[in-house]
């Protein structure tokens, strides 16, 4: 029987990620959540108050320059007797693979929608990922103090485009310059909006009862029409159903303005009450329950140079069961080796501290000296492999050349380490000594060039290369596979993880190779 203190620790955990289209307000909301969790005293917007303050969660130099989240950082804070683990995901579409893997490490998701723009394409793609896993989703419609679209229209769009039932919990009173607050349909409470920059925690000004004299005074001549609007909303929208939310079929919806720190508290209150505690996880041999006492976890991300002073790499681990305690022994299942871990760390946006213990649902960082890969499983001895952590074939390819040929070793090391993070992939063709970098989008090339220069002191040049697509190859017939490798040597490369890859110059070439070698399997994704 598991220890009651341990069971309480697990059931108090809430581990989630935020998804949104770029510029919908994700970084601002992240900051306000940290403010509510009292991790920071004042919030600075991404662009900086008086130009001096960057968002706490955007801690890499290039992110500070561009104002988009490129890497996922992890923040833990206490709130209302719960321990909240927030994973910030990259806010740019070129980093979708990193985001996808981050979503495998959480139990629920907060979706931010820009009230002026509605559902945008990046949100649609991220929702598709959440739907694969039936992830529970809570929605915050942002920017109510601006000119926004009709709220009923926004709810309809969420339902039609994202194929999920929407249940409003709060409802806006006015919008833009006439925004007065939100009304909670379940507690019959008005939360009054006070204009100002939400850099600090505001008092929660409430009016109890839509029929109260205070409510009539706040709404003035609009009171009757607002009462009618609420009746219409109640009649036309879904009621909140907790089980449907946990199944990923219904999303509770909150309205507010993150910049002014309004509506975020109500949303967080709902989140800690309704979001699931750590869920059970599938492995290649059995389901691992979050409340099992034996420790297990998997690596969903690797980040190089989180601290340029230490030139290190950190592997981010989701704890799936049991307790991590400092100095414990754990089995690195892929290589079958037992290691003693004394220096695991936790993060708040670049500030790292040692972890004494961590429980199911927590995210910890392990120092990685090149032996840990994305998808690796760690246990207290049992041989397991957590499943469902994918690697996608890249869509763009560039040859990398050095400005200074003497720095080849540093270039190779830099590209190898950056590819281990999983947002770009390195390919080394068998026919020559070229280095080819594959990516999902153009921004990743800029990031790699910037980080090579900033962290490895290497300047590189990209050149066009005759590669259209990459496929991982495998074959059960050893003799046939040898024949394939000899005949197709000019198209074969080894990727950064040591896997054999077929680089096709055209789509037609790939189709012909697949026809000619039916025994060989060509994969566009592979499990880590």
From Swiss-Prot:
GTP binds at residues 20-27, 88-92, 142-145. One of its GO terms (cellular component) is cytosol. It is found in: Cytoplasm. Its main location: cytoplasm. GO terms for molecular function: GTP binding; GTPase activity; guanosine tetraphosphate binding; translation release factor activity, codon nonspecific; translation release factor activity, codon specific. It comes from the Bacteria. The keyword Glycoprotein does not apply. SUPFAM superfamilies: EF-G C-terminal domain-like, P-loop containing nucleoside triphosphate hydrolases, Translation proteins. Residues 11-279 form the tr-type G domain. Disulfide bonds: none annotated. Keywords: Cytoplasm, GTP-binding, Nucleotide-binding, Protein biosynthesis. GO terms for biological process: regulation of translational termination. InterPro entries: EF-G-like_DII, EFG_III/V, G_TR_CS, P-loop_NTPase, PrfC, RF3_C, RF3_dom_3_sf, RF3_GTP-bd. Increases the formation of ribosomal termination complexes and stimulates activities of RF-1 and RF-2. It binds guanine nucleotides and has strong preference for UGA stop codons. It may interact directly with the ribosome. The stimulation of RF-1 and RF-2 is significantly reduced by GTP and GDP, but not by GMP. HAMAP family: Rel_fac_3. PANTHER family: PEPTIDE CHAIN RELEASE FACTOR RF3 (PTHR43556:SF2). Belongs to the TRAFAC class translation factor GTPase superfamily. Classic translation factor GTPase family. PrfC subfamily. This is Peptide chain release factor 3. It comes from Marinomonas sp. (strain MWYL1).
């Amino acid at each position: 029987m598991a220890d009651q203190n341990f069971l309480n620790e697990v059931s108090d955990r809430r581990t989630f990620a935020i998804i949104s289209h770029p510029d919908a307000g994700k970084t601002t909301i992240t900051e306000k959540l940290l403010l509510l969790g009292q991790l920071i005293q004042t919030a600075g917007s991404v662009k900086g108050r008086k130009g001096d303050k960057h968002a706490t969660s955007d801690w890499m130099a290039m992110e500070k320059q561009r104002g988009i989240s490129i890497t996922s950082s992890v923040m833990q804070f206490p709130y209302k007797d719960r321990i909240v683990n927030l994973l910030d995901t990259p806010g740019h579409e070129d980093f979708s693979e990193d985001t996808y893997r981050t979503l495998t490490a959480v139990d629920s998701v907060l979706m931010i929608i820009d009230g002026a723009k509605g559902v945008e394409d990046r949100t649609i793609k991220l929702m598709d990922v959440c739907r694969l896993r039936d992830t529970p989703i809570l929605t915050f419609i942002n920017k109510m103090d601006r000119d926004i679209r009709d709220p009923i229209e926004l709810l309809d769009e969420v339902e039609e485009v994202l194929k999920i039932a929407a249940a409003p919990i709060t409802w806006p009173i006015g919008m833009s310059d006439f925004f007065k607050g939100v009304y909670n349909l379940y507690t019959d409470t008005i939360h009054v909006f006070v204009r100002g920059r939400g850099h600090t925690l505001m008092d929660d000004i409430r009016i109890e009862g839509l029929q109260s004299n205070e409510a009539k005074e706040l709404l003035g001549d609009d009171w009757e029409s607002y009462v009618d609007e609420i009746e219409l909303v109640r009649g036309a929208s879904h009621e909140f159903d907790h089980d449907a939310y946990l199944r990923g079929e219904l999303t509770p919806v909150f309205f507010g303005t993150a910049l002014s720190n309004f509506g975020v508290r109500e949303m967080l209150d709902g989140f800690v009450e309704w979001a699931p505690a750590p869920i059970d996880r599938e492995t290649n041999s059995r389901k691992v329950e979050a409340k099992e006492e034996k420790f297990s976890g998997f690596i969903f991300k690797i980040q190089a140079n989180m601290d340029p002073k230490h030139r290190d790499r950190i592997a981010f681990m989701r704890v799936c069961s049991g307790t991590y305690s400092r100095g414990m022994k754990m089995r690195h299942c892929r290589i079958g080796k037992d290691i003693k871990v004394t220096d695991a760390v936790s993060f708040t946006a670049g500030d790292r501290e040692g972890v004494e213990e961590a429980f199911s649902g927590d995210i910890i960082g392990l120092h990685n000296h090149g032996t840990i890969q994305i998808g690796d499983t760690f246990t207290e001895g049992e041989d397991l492999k957590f499943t469902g952590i994918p690697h996608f074939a890249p869509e763009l390819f560039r040859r990398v050349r050095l400005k200074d040929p003497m720095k080849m070793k540093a270039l190779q090391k830099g590209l190898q380490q950056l590819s281990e993070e999983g947002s770009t992939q390195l390919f080394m063709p068998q026919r020559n000594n070229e280095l080819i970098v594959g990516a999902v989008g153009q921004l990743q090339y800029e990031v790699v060039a910037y980080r090579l220069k900033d962290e490895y002191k290497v300047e590189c040049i990209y050149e066009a290369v005759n590669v259209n697509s990459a496929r991982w190859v495998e074959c059960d017939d050893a003799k046939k596979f040898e024949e394939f490798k000899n005949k197709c040597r000019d198209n074969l490369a080894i990727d950064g993880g040591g896997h054999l890859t077929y680089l096709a110059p055209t789509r037609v070439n790939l189709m012909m190779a697949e026809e000619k070698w039916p025994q060989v399997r060509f994969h566009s994704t592979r499990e880590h």
